[in-house]
From Swiss-Prot:
Binds directly to 16S ribosomal RNA. Gene3D superfamilies: Ribosomal protein S20 (1.20.58.110). Belongs to the bacterial ribosomal protein bS20 family. Keywords: Ribonucleoprotein, Ribosomal protein, RNA-binding, rRNA-binding. InterPro entries: Ribosomal_bS20, Ribosomal_bS20_sf. This is Small ribosomal subunit protein bS20. The gene is rpsT. One of its GO terms (molecular function) is structural constituent of ribosome.
Amino acid sequence: MANSKSAKKRALQSEKRRQHNASRRSMLRTYVKRVIAAIKSGDHKAATEAFAIAQPIVDRMATKGLIHKNKAGRQKARLNAKIKAIAA
């Protein structure tokens, strides 16, 4: 338990950040799941549209430090490859 005034403040800030990050991480997962659902349905147009919406969100979360930039790149590359496989 935090005892000093500064430690209590840090604990409050950490909790606030944890909740904010959890919300953003949930939002990120939701948009990625929408792309995956569109891919599984086999609808190329819907998958492309969902990916166009999800892509900047993935990038934004990487710049905010919520996910690693390599993970963001890997996620986008894999989703894009699956979308291209539908079209072929």
